[in-house]
Amino acid sequence: METTYRREALTVRVIFCTSGDSAETIADVLTGAPTSASFFSVLHDLFYSQILAPRVTLKLCLPARRPGNGTRCSPVLVLRTDASVASGFLGGRPLEASDIKYMLLSDQTAGLFKPLLEIIGGARAPPNQDACTFQSQVAWLRTKFVTALRKLYKMTPSPYWMLSAFGAQEAQFVLTSSFYFFEHTVVCTTETVSHLSRLFSPQQGQTLVSVTSHEELGQLYGTSPFRRRVPAFVAYVKEKLARDSLETEAIDRTIDQIRGKLMLSNQDLVHFIYISFYQCLNKRAFLRYSRQTSSSSALRELGEDPQLCGALHGEFRDHVQSYYHKKTYLSTYIDIRYVGGVLPDGYFGGSLVGERCVYWCGQSKDTASLLATISQQVPHLRLQNEFAGMLDVAALRGSDDGQFKEGLFSHSQALPLYRCEFLGKQFFTMLQEDGLERYWEQSVIFPGDQDWDMLSDKDLTYRIFYHDLSLSLPTLKEQLLVSRHEYFNPRLPVYRWVLDFDLPVCRDIDRTFEEVHSLCCSLREAILDIIQLLGPVDPRTHPVYFFKSACPPDEWRGEDVASTSFCRCHDKLGMRIIVPFPEGVCVVGSEPMVALTGILNRTIKLDPELVHRFPSIQKKGGPFDCGIYGRGRSVRLPHCYKVGLVGELCRLLKILVCHPAPNGKAQYVRRAFTLRELLHHSPGHSAGHVGRIIYSIMDRNENFLENKTISYLPAKIPHIFQRIETLSGRSIEDWLHSAVWDKAYDTICKFFPDEKAQQFSHVAFTQQGENIIQLRPRQGRHFLCINHNHKNKSKTVRVFLTLHSIRVSEVTVTLMSQCFASKCNNNVPTAHFSFVVPVGLAS
């Protein structure tokens, strides 16, 4: 049954077009100039079939060029005509411009353009301004007026932009365009309305691909049966958007409730939010929700309670909350594997004490020569010719494998391997006897004979004095007493957990002893929580030794230092932390130590109080370096100096007493100056006895948020190099030169400084890995830093292209670089720009 519109006065908004230049045609109509153009109705807001009102007011509108959240169309002409004429016009019959002049309501139309004419008129007033009419104003300013219309409104000769924006199916176009132009109480994107139109009307009507003119589009709109459904569609959109808002607010609220109880790093937070939204809005859940909200009646049946956020309850929430809670994390997700047996020896005990230093030392060429000699004499050892072979030599013991050591030392035992910087060179040293403890006895002053247990940690720390040095010593033997680094040896058992702690801190902020000591106490608690997973210890008395890197000298700061200041470090606060494993426990291999330190990094990130006081703990992987347990990695010993660029001694690792137990402070301090208590592989008291040999430590859910996120991302196309070569018929290098590098080099020249861009004028490509192409300059192997102008302008920066594809028709190419400078995040890859290269990857 057709609906009629019974009003004495009816106003209809019409989106129109003309047969000629619309801006010029409007100016002709307003000035009374002769024109043969015709006006066509494209869209209008009269959604009923019959008009019974005798007269109709037509507001002819044009689409706004940049509407933002404002009005999408604005009237430019106001007409009044008979119902029959209006009905024909709205149904697709054109109106001639000559007829429109007689229908024009001049006063109302003039009111529409008054602000515009005032702006474009400016100081150029027409003659006889007092007697000037609206028609004469438009005529006087016609050129500017026409230009302004073109800037304000979208006037195109083709309907293609409308079909692209609102859809090429009849129902989709009619419903979406009508809502977009004539419904201003709800603001949402065209894509959203288009999606809702497909939900609202499964029947889409005829296709519009054959429509080539606004006239044809207007005729289709004027006769479309879907036009009558626009009011119902508007009501549905409002209900649907209200329901969507309810659901999204519930999702946000639930996510905030869950993450408010979690200690998440920035990276983990991004992954958590992505996974949370995926849980609620993945394809299956979204399609199910769309079916449940496809009509007004279905929306009413859904009830008032939100549906989508239910996916965040249950297993996912419990899993996240238990993993990101310190107690449940350590008790649930850490897997430790061990075997029972006699604990192996570490370093030979006699090599850690002595009245003097007895050692072998040499530089890189000497170690290579020694390894070559040993390999000739004892070939079955299969020693590496590189420095890693020295670690094998240091670990060998016994009359069989280690007999060649008797030519170097008086016995064949496992020895520590150190690195010492002297005279600007690196010396590698194995010691059979070590006078380091005796040197400490002579160069460090301890408190008097009073009861040390009566002193606080602060008093003890302040009453231990070092003999400060500032310059390297005359001989290598003396230099070994003040500066050395111990190498981690994967072939020896680990009895002590040596930790390298670097915490980024704010510049120009001094810290009191109490603040640093509180940090140490929190770290001690976290370390002992993990140590107790390996074996039983008394957390009140088990020693954890802290050695803080000395602050820069006062003169470096150029300002007064407050008397209460204990730490004046800027950029980072560095400490060496050492804790013995429980009695009857040792760890073998690098991997368990790396995993154990990674667990510690995660554990301290789960301490809300600690993170609140030191937010930088959450940065990157954590403040504890997991890389010091690899082959060929070394750390500076406590009570030793760092050697500067010109041989100066600085940043002494001084003891910071942190032993909360009321008793045992004297023993704690004395052991902190005992060499066997400070090394990775010095034997424990239980070496040679039956105990636990731990060979695997694993976080069962390590990086589970990241891994889960990756599993939800679109799958990458594998073997990308082979596919490109097969389908293009060219080698990767030829394809890069012809299809990739020109675009990459143009981008480099456009956005990089000239001195940085010119080094890329001639490059070679080297395939590295499955999807990495390394760039080589014409001269040398690497490039200058792209990010910063470092003082050291050496060409050490690695630049490469990564290829990534998730669509069979294109490859995403990213230019990346790695710089070793601390200002560039110490070799962390930096992405500079990406672009897409079309390629036929479909097989």
From Swiss-Prot:
It holds the Pfam family Herpes_UL52. Coiled coil: none annotated. One of its GO terms (biological process) is DNA replication. The keyword Zinc applies. The record marks D500, D502 as: Essential for primase activity. Its main location: host cell. Essential component of the helicase/primase complex. Unwinds the DNA at the replication forks and generates single-stranded DNA for both leading and lagging strand synthesis. The primase initiates primer synthesis and thereby produces large amount of short RNA primers on the lagging strand that the polymerase elongates using dNTPs. It comes from the Viruses. Signal peptide: none annotated. This is DNA primase. One of its GO terms (cellular component) is host cell nucleus. It comes from Human herpesvirus 8 type P (isolate GK18). A zinc finger (CHC2-type) spans 785-824. GO terms for molecular function: ATP binding; DNA-directed RNA polymerase activity; helicase activity; hydrolase activity; zinc ion binding. Its EC number is 2.7.7.-.
